[in-house]
Amino acid sequence: MTDRWVCLDVGETLIDETRIWSLWADELGVPRLTFLAALGAVIARGGEHRDVFPIFGADDWRQRLLAVERAYGGFTDADLYPDAHRAFAGLRQRGYRLAIVANQPEARAEQLRALGFDAEVMAMSDGMGVSKPDSAFFDQALGLMGSPEPAAVAYVGDRVDNDVLPSIAAGMRAVWLRRGPWGVIQRLPESARPALVVESLDELVERIGEAW
């Protein structure tokens, strides 16, 4: 049988991003709840994360990235969703080949490896030179996996716009993980048919076979 791959997103898939968004609120001097509510409103109207900053007059947010990154210090065990390691091990035990390919700074790949995620393929958008939802991101991801048939790859992510729709367009099996701000706020277009919709990575492990 042809090898099947499970390719995982990072933010709100393996990593709970509450800490990084809370640090942004602190940097801007905004109550955390207020900042997170504004982020949710931006998502609900179809905006990008960067659209939250002008709400608080922070047009200079790019100049503040370094300060926030210093405070964040990269991924830690405390940032992992509780099911992340279980799912990684469970998918491997079921014979799936594993990749992690996501929109992230390049340094995140080494941080994930340090946390025990030894995926066969690990690539971040900054190092790839292209980001989701660009189709070239998914083409490059397939190339890094050795160019399997797209239908042999399940791409797992929380965002409809960045993960589900473009992975369907690439011919992959789209798996929508409904958690995190984007996962619970965004809605699927009526025409979109992901291969699988799950609420957790534990559910993913139990139901991944249904993606095919």
Could you describe each region identified by the protein language model?
Residues 1-96, 106-109, 118, 124:
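N-terminal helical cap/lid subdomain that shapes the substrate entry/recognition surface
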Residues 1-6, 85-212:
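Asp-based, Mg2+/Mn2+-dependent phosphohydrolase catalytic module
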